[in-house]
Amino acid sequence: LYDMYELGIRYDKPYRKSARIVGDTMGKYHPHGDSSIYDSLVVMAQDFKKGQVLVDGHGNFGSIEGDGAAAMRYTEARLTKFTQEVCLADLDKNVIDFGPNFDETEKEPLVLPMRVPNLLINGAEGIAVGMATSIPTHNLCEVVDAVKAYMKNDKITTKQLMKYIKGPDFPTGGIVVNKDDLPAIYESGQGKIKLRGKVEVEELKGGKKQLVITEIPYTMIGAGIGKFLNDVCNLVESKKTTDIVDISNQSSKEGIRIVIELKRGADVENLKNMLYKKTRLEDTFGVNMLAVANGRPETLSLKQIIEHHVDFQFELATRKYTTLLGKEREKSEVQEGLIKACDVIDLIIEILRGSKSVKDARACLVNGETENIKFKSAISKKMAAMLRFTERQATAILEMRLYRLIGLEIEALQKEHEKTLENIARYEDILNNYDSMAGVIMEELDSYKKEFGRK
């Protein structure tokens, strides 16, 4: 993601070949083969695996039925707007630490300045030596509301947070059967979630009916769909059910649609229960919310994940507004110097014309040194000796263009300075007032919820 950001492959720019992205990433940051890099890029582009897609893929990026993506030389990609605005925002404002890459020729971010808990929204699955993690995906709107609730009351319990986060929200849909187990799972960070596919009954002509599966357990992604179709066929062939006439997979880009045509008079409820019992239409998602927190792997509760995220947001905001405040103070210093210079511009011009070098002129502006400067009068020399511009102001004066002396330009400079002072006051308030900083963070969360959230 960072490499795509650095290459300028933004959401509002043209797609670039995946091979170009993979090659650049491998050469700069990950010299361990291209397959793992491309596989990662592909997963981040698959909307059936991610709650929020991080990469906008163009071409064949695989299917929910387990078809692999086309070779990287054929596909193209770019960042999504979500990634650019929520995952990579303010990288130029010193909000995170950077470290050297493998050969110390580049800098790479140690973390990304994620503005929402991506660990909850997009989930995570993986294994390492002696440990594994499995975190389900969640709804962005619900997660944002939970984060805001924690910020308003950090004594809130996990059970109270579940007023906002009802449970997992998988890209493939599905129904959580054991909802009563969710509080314990979110409290301990471990457990098993029973998922069922969503089955609808459609009436056909002649009194016939058909079952239509529109949502599936997340665990059925890939080969699981094909296995389900085979399992249903086996139920028919082994005479365990005689109610099924035909089964077809009519899924498309619009969504899942698996149709099971039934005989007239079929026992619908009995058949649904059989499908849940004998196939993966009901399956288990194992939860183990293991994550690296403060450099150590730790199994976290729902509240702990949100707590770590909120702490990180305050760290990001503190670094961001400290950087902005520093820049505004520097700008104010320069503006004050230019405004002051305009009031004594004739004297400054006399200093410049009488100086033998830029060094002499700067010394006069900063320290009032007049020894190496020719003045028209003793009064001018006396006034010059009283000048005390800062180094930054002196540089700005020496680089100032003559058009800045126009009356309207001076007036505009004064208005600009007033705006700078307002910004300084605002940034100081944010940095010195918890409620102000929390308000800014929550405003950003609301904007992300409005733009990227879904029901």
Q: Language-model segments: what does each one mean?
A:
Residues 125, 131-455:
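C-terminal interaction appendages of subunits in large macromolecular complexes
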Residues 1-189, 257-259:
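Catalytic phosphate-handling regions of large nucleic-acid enzymes and associated NTPases
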